[in-house]
């Protein structure tokens, strides 16, 4: 159970990081 929670948290962090990188890429392209 504990491992499952840790995995889901890590997954959400990775997804948010990818979104942040995508956003930064877009802003850099605009600039």
From Swiss-Prot:
This is Uncharacterized protein ORF7. It comes from Chlamydia phage 1 (Bacteriophage Chp1).
């Amino acid at each position: 159970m504990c491992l499952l929670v840790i995995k889901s948290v890590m997954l959400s962090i990775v997804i948010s990081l990818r979104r942040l990188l995508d956003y930064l890429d877009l802003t850099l392209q605009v600039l």
